[in-house]
């Protein structure tokens, strides 16, 4: 049986420390200076996708900080079941 879901996209221009995923899949795309996502370095143009199987629900909290002082440009894309 098909399940309904929606896609949410959010742009972040400042560091964040407790972004709750609360979704089935989440993707981070860095379009600015280098950042650290939960300790993993992401350079400009890098993307990290965390996928889930049908029925799974991720509750991980994510933190994103710039590698040097300044603003960031990170896009967060979530797949959320209705």
Segments and roles (model prediction):
Residues 1, 40-44, 69:
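Exposed regions on extracellular, virion, or secretory-pathway luminal proteins
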Residues 10-12, 40-53:
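Tight coil/turn sites that cap or link beta-strands
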Residues 35, 69-79:
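Edge beta-strands of jelly-roll/beta-sandwich modules across compartments, strongly enriched
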């Amino acid at each position: 049986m098909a399940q309904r879901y929606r896609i949410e996209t959010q742009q972040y221009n400042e560091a964040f420390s407790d972004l709750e995923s609360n979704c089935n899949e989440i993707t981070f795309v860095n379009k600015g200076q280098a950042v650290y996502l939960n300790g993993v370095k992401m350079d400009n143009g890098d993307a990290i996708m965390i996928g889930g199987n049908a029925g799974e629900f991720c509750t991980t909290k994510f933190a994103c900080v710039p590698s040097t002082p300044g603003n960031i440009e990170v896009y967060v894309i979530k797949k959320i079941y209705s």
